[in-house]
């Protein structure tokens, strides 16, 4: 499977996370996650991120996004993008998930995230955020 997600970083260096729906039929129910999902046939990972942002949060124009990492495991190739973007979670028209919130690194470290995103975000903060 090929997946794509995006790390949305605000001007306070906090990451926007989505609390996944609490449905037993989905992986990692009721856990915090970065926005994203499965890359569909005929779609690039970047197109998938843009589609998922539209489907999950009604965000139509992300503008330029940056590739952070491509993570490969036995069953998954996960394309992780990032962008600086200040969004107000209270005005986002959330279509999937229970809610969205900004997390700083300290809170991320105290929260078990879906998939392997704790490690991904640790790496992101040390490689990207440190430059700002």
Locate the predicted segments by residue:
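A short coil-to-beta-strand element that immediately follows conserved catalytic motifs
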Residues: 60-69
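Nudix hydrolase/Nudix homology domain
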Residues: 25, 93-132
């Amino acid at each position: 499977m090929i997946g794509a997600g995006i790390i949305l970083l605000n001007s306070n260096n906090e990451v926007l996370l989505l609390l996944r729906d609490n449905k037993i039929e989905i992986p990692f129910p009721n856990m915090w996650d970065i926005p994203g999902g499965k890359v569909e046939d005929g779609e690039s990972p970047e197109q998938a991120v843009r589609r998922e942002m539209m489907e999950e949060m009604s965000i139509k124009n992300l503008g330029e996004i940056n590739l952070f990492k491509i993570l490969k495991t036995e069953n998954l190739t996960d394309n992780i993008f990032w962008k600086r973007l200040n969004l107000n979670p209270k005005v986002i028209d959330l279509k999937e998930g229970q809610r969205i919130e900004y997390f700083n690194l300290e809170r991320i470290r105290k929260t078990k995230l879906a998939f392997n995103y704790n490690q991904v975000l640790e790496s992101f903060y040390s490689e990207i955020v440190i430059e700002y």
